[in-house]
Amino acid sequence: MSHLVKMENGQSQTIQEMLGCIERYNPDHLKILESYVQDQAKNNSYDLEANLAVLKLYQFNPHMLNFDITYTILLKSLTNLPHTDFVMAKCLLLPQQMKDENVQTIIDLADILERADFTLFWQRAEVNRTMFRHIAGFHDSIRKFVSHVVGTTFQTIKKDLLKELLGGIEDSTLESWIKRNGWKHQGHDLVVVATQDDKIKTKNITEKIEFENVGALMAQCL
C-alpha cells in the first residue's frame, strides 16, 4: 500500500521523501506513519527509518503516544536481528514506555535472543503468542536469525537439537530450512552446517622492504 503525506502547500510526498526533510518532525504526519507501521506488520515489510521517526515523534509529543504501535515497532526490530535496530528503537523510548509491562516483556525476549538462549525464547514466545500474532512472518524471521547463529557456531549439529533451536519444528519444516541454508545431512542424526572448506583460512604475508626504499623518508624525519 502506498502512503502519501500531504504537505501544507497542498502537495503530496512519499513517506521516504518526507523522512528526508524537516517534515519528519511534524506531528500532523504521525497518523500516516502509524498506519505505515501497521502495514509493515501485515505485509511482512520493514522500514527502520520510518519506525524510528514514529518513536521520535512520541518523544516530542508524549500526549500522542500509542502503545500498540510501540509494541509493533519493537517486535519488528527483532525480526531484523542480528542488526542493532532493537537497540536504536529502545534508546528512543519514553519513561512511560519503559515502565509498560508489554514493553518489558519484549525487552526480555530481545535479551534472550541476544544471548542465544533459543529454547527459552520459544517457550516465552508461546506464552506471549498473542503479542505478535498480527506480525506476518515473525516466527520465520526469528528462525532466520537462529540459522545465522547456528551457522557461525556449529560445524555439525544434531537434528533434534536443531529442531529445538528453530522452535520445535516438524521434520518437513526442518528440511526446508536445511535447504534454505545450504546445509547437508550426515547420517541419520546429524546436519552438516559448515565444512572445513567453508572455514576462513588465514594467510601470513611477508613483504621485504629494502633500506633504500625508506631512507629518504627517514631522512625527512630527522
Curated annotation (Swiss-Prot):
This is Eukaryotic translation initiation factor 3 subunit K. PROSITE patterns: PCI. Residues 46-208 form the PCI domain. GO terms for cellular component: eukaryotic 43S preinitiation complex; eukaryotic 48S preinitiation complex; eukaryotic translation initiation factor 3 complex. Belongs to the eIF-3 subunit K family. One of its GO terms (molecular function) is translation initiation factor activity. It comes from Drosophila grimshawi (Hawaiian fruit fly). The keyword Cytoplasm applies. HAMAP family: eIF3k. Pfam families: CSN8_PSD8_EIF3K (PF10075). SUPFAM superfamilies: ARM repeat, Winged helix' DNA-binding domain. Component of the eukaryotic translation initiation factor 3 (eIF-3) complex, which is involved in protein synthesis of a specialized repertoire of mRNAs and, together with other initiation factors, stimulates binding of mRNA and methionyl-tRNAi to the 40S ribosome. The eIF-3 complex specifically targets and initiates translation of a subset of mRNAs involved in cell proliferation. Its main location: cytoplasm. It is found in: Cytoplasm. One of its GO terms (biological process) is regulation of translational initiation. Keywords: Cytoplasm, Initiation factor, Protein biosynthesis. Component of the eukaryotic translation initiation factor 3 (eIF-3) complex. The eIF-3 complex interacts with pix.
